């Protein structure tokens, strides 16, 4: 571990030199690339230096015990050794976590897709609750939410809603939302007061850059049609809605949220690029999962990950056995407690795998 940390520190010093080089300063692409690389290893280098300093102080304190000391001084040195041992152990554990390979998608924006599944209209209404929850969470994080496509039902729910959340580290926190979300509550339309169970599925895709997914125009079929509102009625006589089909993979994306066909095509391309990138990622992950499986779940979108129980104001995350009696707050976007618990569990799992 120490050899690896030393080489990371050497790379950090080299990046300092490169970022002062006039040739790099005048090259925006290289400047951005090196700045990001340095930012990514900054915390690791800082903690390593703290660890090294504490280790040196610990060695010096232990050496002092070999000298002739009076009883009071000896007790002081022993106390210092005890504190420094705790500090080095804490820093060592932090370094182990920092050395876990980082998900290359963590810093990206995220495209989220929510679909009402089992439960008909009640599932569509629950999809709306989830969309609002994620929108509020994004707002609390200082992120921006933009709807890409929405299929609204007559009662104001969503058969499907696709939206992008833009902000630093958005994917790193929301990627754990992949899967089936279950709701237990009494529907407003239910006169008998019986609790119904419905589900909605959530997919989280990292936004893909053009350089990451090479899509050729010849591989895309573009269809245009008149956009429609709730219930299917036409709301636009112009052919502004766009459907893109990526012929090699069969991935299809529609967008009719904007009045302009050009803007709809731009939005659809973002979703198409993310879905194709995600398809490749899923295939690579499937190979990896044959040998190892994460403790916080496989990321399989059919996997039931969480239950929202309205009568008991309870949320349960089944992957880590977390139960919180704060459903009302969570639906208002206060997801930090859940997200942080999932991150900690994921890091612990990866650490165990790397040590195994």
Curated annotation (Swiss-Prot):
One of its GO terms (molecular function) is translation release factor activity, codon specific. SMART domains: PCRF. Keywords: Cytoplasm, Methylation, Protein biosynthesis. Gene3D superfamilies: 3.30.160.20, 3.30.70.1660, 6.10.140.1950. The modification N5-methylglutamine is found at residue 233. GO terms for cellular component: cytoplasm. InterPro entries: PCRF, Pep_chain_release_fac_I, Pep_chain_release_fac_I_sf, Prokaryotic/Mito_RF, RF-1. The keyword Zinc does not apply. This is Peptide chain release factor 1. It comes from Bacillus subtilis (strain 168). The gene is prfA.
């Amino acid at each position: 571990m120490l050899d690896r940390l030393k080489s990371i520190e050497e790379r950090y010093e080299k990046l300092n030199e490169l970022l002062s080089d006039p040739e790099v300063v005048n090259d925006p692409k290289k400047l951005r690339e090196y700045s990001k690389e340095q930012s990514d290893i900054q915390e690791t280098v800082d903690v390593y230096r703290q660890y090294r300093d504490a280790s040196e102080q610990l060695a010096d304190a232990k050496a002092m015990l070999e000298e002739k000391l009076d009883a009071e001084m000896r007790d002081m040195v022993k106390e210092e050794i005890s504190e420094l041992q705790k500090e080095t152990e804490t820093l060592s554990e932090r370094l182990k976590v920092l050395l876990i390979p980082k998900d290359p998608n963590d810093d990206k924006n995220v495209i989220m897709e929510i679909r009402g599944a089992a439960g008909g209209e009640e599932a569509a209404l629950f999809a709306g609750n989830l969309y609002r929850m994620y929108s509020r969470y994004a707002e609390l994080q200082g992120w921006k939410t933009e709807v890409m496509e929405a299929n609204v039902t007559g009662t104001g729910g969503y058969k499907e809603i696709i939206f992008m959340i833009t902000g630093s580290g958005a994917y790193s926190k929301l990627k754990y939302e992949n899967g089936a979300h279950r709701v237990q509550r009494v529907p407003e339309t239910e006169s008998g007061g019986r609790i119904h169970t419905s589900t909605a599925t959530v997919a989280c895709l990292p936004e893909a850059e053009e350089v990451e997914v090479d899509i050729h125009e010849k591989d895309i079929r573009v269809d245009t049609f008149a956009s429609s509102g709730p219930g299917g009625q036409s709301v636009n006589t112009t052919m502004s809605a766009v459907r893109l089909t990526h012929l090699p993979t069969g991935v299809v994306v529609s967008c009719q949220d904007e009045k302009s066909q050009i803007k709809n095509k731009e939005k659809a391309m973002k979703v198409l690029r993310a879905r194709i990138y995600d398809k490749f990622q899923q295939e690579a992950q499937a190979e990896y999962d044959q040998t190892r499986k994460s403790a916080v779940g496989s990321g399989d979108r059919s996997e039931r990950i969480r239950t929202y129980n309205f009568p008991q104001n309870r949320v349960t995350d089944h992957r880590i056995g977390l139960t919180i009696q704060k459903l009302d707050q969570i639906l208002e976007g206060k997801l930090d407690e859940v997200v942080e618990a999932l991150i900690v569990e994921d890091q612990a799992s990866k650490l165990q795998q790397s040590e195994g």
